[in-house]
Structure formats: C-alpha cells, structure tokens
Amino acid sequence: MFSNVGWGEILLLFIVGLIVIGPERLPRLMEDLKAAIVAARTAINNAKQNLDTDFGEEFDEIRKPMAQIAQIRSMSPKTAITRALFDGDDSFLDSFDPKKIMADDTAGQAHRQQVAKTGTTPEHAEVVERPADRIDPTQSPNTPGKNNDGGKPPAGGGYTWTDLI
C-alpha cells in the first residue's frame, strides 16, 4: 500500500503537518503516534504468544510438512532425484557426468595413441564400406538444400536419409 511512497512525499506530508498542526503541538502528536505504534506491536506479539501456547502442538504438526515442502521446493532437480532414489548418495550420477567421462582415459584415446605409435591400425580392425559411400560416376552430385528438379529445395530441408548414414 505504501510501497511507492518516496522521501519527497514524506517531506511534503511533514511540511503540511507542520503548517496545519503547528510547531507547538507537533512534538506531542509525534509522541502519541510513537506510543500507538508501540502499543500495536505489543498487542500483536501478545496475540502470537497466546496462539502459540493454545495451539502450539497443532501448529507444529502443520509446520513440519510445510517445512519439508519448502525444503523440497528449494532443491535442484539433481538433488531431488538423488534424495528420492538414492538416499542422497550422488556417486551413482557421477557416471553420467560428461566432464568426468571425458577426463577418463577412453578406448578411443588408447586406439589413437596406438595408431600414432605404430602408424597402422590394429590387425583385428576391419574397414567396412557402406553402400552410401559408393559414388556412381554417372550420377550428378546433390548438394544439401538443392534438388535436381529446377534448383528448388525439397520440403524436408534438402537432406536425405543417406546424409545421416
């Protein structure tokens, strides 16, 4: 309600109050306003204490699930999954971490090192030629995004299944 009241408006209200109320009665009015604020705060605190003593146990029963819900809502998805499925042990999810996977020595790295040392591929490796790799010399090459039918791109964006193989 008063969140958009700035210091300029407060100063204007103070000046209007000084003019309307007068400098003689303004200090007494400020003391009365201060006493009213203090009385309201003590009344609110007393009401809170009465509610806590009368309904404290019932409120505690409601507060526990609400605190658990607030804790779950503040968790990240990874933390929620590890807590629900793995009882908080996140070591299982480390096997899916790409940084840790790439940091480990993989079979591909070992193969590249062996090829670099010997200059040849291992004997058990065989080269497989796919039918898509064969080029028919009588056929004109297709470029992605173009069709041989007047240069218009096909509806699928110019790529075929052979581009993916």
Curated annotation (Swiss-Prot):
Lineage: Bacteria, Bacillati, Actinomycetota, Actinomycetes, Mycobacteriales
Keywords: Cell membrane, Membrane, Protein transport, Translocation, Transmembrane, Transmembrane helix, Transport
NCBIfam families: PRK00182.1, tatB
Molecular function as annotated in GO: protein transmembrane transporter activity
Chief subcellular location: membrane
A GO term from the CC aspect: TAT protein transport complex
Keyword Transport: yes
Membrane-spanning intervals of the chain: 2-22
Domain of life, per lineage: Bacteria
InterPro entries, alphabetized: TatA/B/E, TatB
Membrane topology: Single-pass membrane protein
Localization in the cell: Cell membrane
Organism: Corynebacterium efficiens (strain DSM 44549 / YS-314 / AJ 12310 / JCM 11189 / NBRC 100395)
Recorded family membership: Belongs to the TatB family.
Amino acid composition bias (Polar residues), ranges on this chain: 111-121, 137-146
Keyword Transmembrane attributed: yes
Functional summary from the UniProt entry: Part of the twin-arginine translocation (Tat) system that transports large folded proteins containing a characteristic twin-arginine motif in their signal peptide across membranes. Together with TatC, TatB is part of a receptor directly interacting with Tat signal peptides. TatB may form an oligomeric binding site that transiently accommodates folded Tat precursor proteins before their translocation.
UniProt-listed GO biological process terms: protein transport by the Tat complex
Biased composition (Basic and acidic residues): 123-136
Segments for region (Disordered): 103-165
Name of the protein described by the UniProt record: Sec-independent protein translocase protein TatB
Gene that encodes it: tatB
Subunit structure: The Tat system comprises two distinct complexes: a TatABC complex, containing multiple copies of TatA, TatB and TatC subunits, and a separate TatA complex, containing only TatA subunits. Substrates initially bind to the TatABC complex, which probably triggers association of the separate TatA complex to form the active translocon.
